[in-house]
Amino acid sequence: MKKRIDTFWRYRNLLFELVKKGIKLKYRRSYLGIIWSLLEPVMTTIVLTIVFGTLYGNKDHTFPLYILSGRLLYSYFAQGTKVSLKSIRQNSAMIKKVYVPKYLYPLSSVLYNFIIFLISLIVLVLLGIFTGNYPTLHWLLIAFPLLVLLIMTFGVGIILATIGVFFRDMEYLWSVALML
């Protein structure tokens, strides 16, 4: 176990650079850049609130908060696992040239999506304040479930990345599975 921790520590700078690269690549050639991580959840929440609020006749003022919180969590898991699935295969050229622990690629994918997810949580906090749910100390309890979500996403992502190396169709199957 100590050897694995030492290996991880030795490659921490590479992990940091891979996370930075992932964020930059996600928003390159985009006029708004990382602002999309704030705008996209807002626009999706508005559409879903109008559609489902009208469809179900929901008049609860906190309904958009429920929609946004569920959507942000699911979106992070889906994006994190999708990008992890392709991460080892997309970096195969570097893996063949230089020894790097292969788990760094799925981990960096999960981490950069987690950072984007944390930025998106700003929208959730603002919507909570707007709907009258002001931040309290209880909001800090969200840290543990988010850590569990991060670990679960990494676990699923590394399994999918391993399968994705040998079975390229897994990318399409996983996209379908996420829609279920």
Model-based region annotation:
Residues 1-180:
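Hydrophobic transmembrane alpha-helices and immediately adjacent juxtamembrane helices
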